[in-house]
């Protein structure tokens, strides 16, 4: 069984930064932890035409990752995210050391 990275990207909607950060701390991170997903890295894009934020979580297996992504809790979290961010996207990749896109 190989570890899997959940890579998530998004742009905070202009003027919604305060609402986003409150949501992130009070709901997003606790909801992920409730699903057994712990964020391990996060990056902010300061130059270029890429999503403003990239966050990653390492999961123990593809089966575990699929179970999380198929859950109603994950779907609900995505709906809440879309109210505050644009271009929310995610993908699963085999975990390697270091930064991954």
What is the meaning of each model-derived region?
Residues 23-40, 58-93:
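An amphipathic, aromatic/His-enriched active-site/gating alpha helix that lines ligand/cofactor pockets
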Residues 4-11, 56:
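Active-site-flanking beta-strand signature of metal-NTP-handling nucleotidyl enzymes
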Residues 1-2, 101:
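Basic/polar N-terminal segments that are highly enriched at the extreme N-terminus
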Residues 3-5, 36-40, 53:
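Short, flexible segments with low predicted structural confidence
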Residues 11-23:
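Short, surface-exposed ligand-recognition loops at beta-strand->loop->(often short) alpha-helix junctions
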Residues 47-51:
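Short acidic/glycine-enriched loop/turn segments that link adjacent beta-strands
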Residues 93-101:
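Short, low-order "capping/linker" segments at domain edges
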Residues 42-45:
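Short, solvent-exposed loop/turn elements at beta->coil junctions and helix N-caps
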């Amino acid at each position: 069984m190989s570890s899997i990275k959940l890579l998530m990207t998004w742009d905070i909607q202009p003027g919604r930064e305060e609402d986003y950060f409150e949501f992130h701390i009070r709901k997003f991170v606790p909801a992920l932890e409730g699903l057994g997903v712990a964020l391990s890295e996060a990056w902010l894009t300061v130059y270029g035409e890429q999503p403003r934020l990239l966050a990653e979580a390492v999961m123990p297996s593809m089966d575990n990752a699929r179970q999380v992504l198929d859950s109603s809790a994950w779907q609900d979290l995505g709906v809440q995210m879309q109210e505050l961010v644009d271009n929310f996207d995610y993908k699963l990749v085999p975990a390697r050391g270091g930064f991954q896109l």
